[in-house]
Amino acid sequence: MTVETTEGWTLAPDIAWARIAGGQAAVMTLEAGQPLLLSASGDVIWDVLVGGRTPEDDLVADPPAPLSTTDVTVQVAEAFGLDPADVAADVHAFLEMLEAHGVLVRVRTA
């Protein structure tokens, strides 16, 4: 039996994040220590990645399950009331940017 895998994303194990005034998310790796302030649309993507958790929830919870690029794209599109095809390129670019900053890790999902 063959199990199909797809590209997915998981949070890096050494990150910290917080909500600042206005609810914006600031994320960083503990090693770099340089926070990355997310845009409003970035906040929506981040909320999908963390499963709607708060930073306080993250302190005591197991890490969120990895999500496929498709799952992230569909959930973001739903949040904005758009078709997934309309947001796919922007979502993928944002995920790759978070990966470049060490906040996300690319994985294979079943």
Which ranges hold each PLM region?
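Long, low-complexity, charged/polar intrinsically disordered regions in eukaryotic proteins
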Residues: 1-33
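Long, charge-rich, low-complexity alpha-helical segments
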Residues: 31-110
